[in-house]
């Protein structure tokens, strides 16, 4: 199975391993709701 990568240039993540943590993806959704395009 291919691993998902949820890292972003705008939102930091201090988890380990951070590639598999969806928190950054959830933050990107909240940015979009505020019309902030953070990809």
Curated annotation (Swiss-Prot):
EC number(s) stated in the UniProt entry for this protein: 1.1.1.124
The reaction(s) this protein catalyses: D-fructose + NADP(+) = 5-dehydro-D-fructose + NADPH + H(+)
Keyword NADP assigned: yes
Keywords: NADP, Oxidoreductase
Presence of keyword NADP: yes
Single GO MF descriptor: fructose 5-dehydrogenase (NADP+) activity
Identification of the protein by name: Fructose 5-dehydrogenase [NADP(+)]
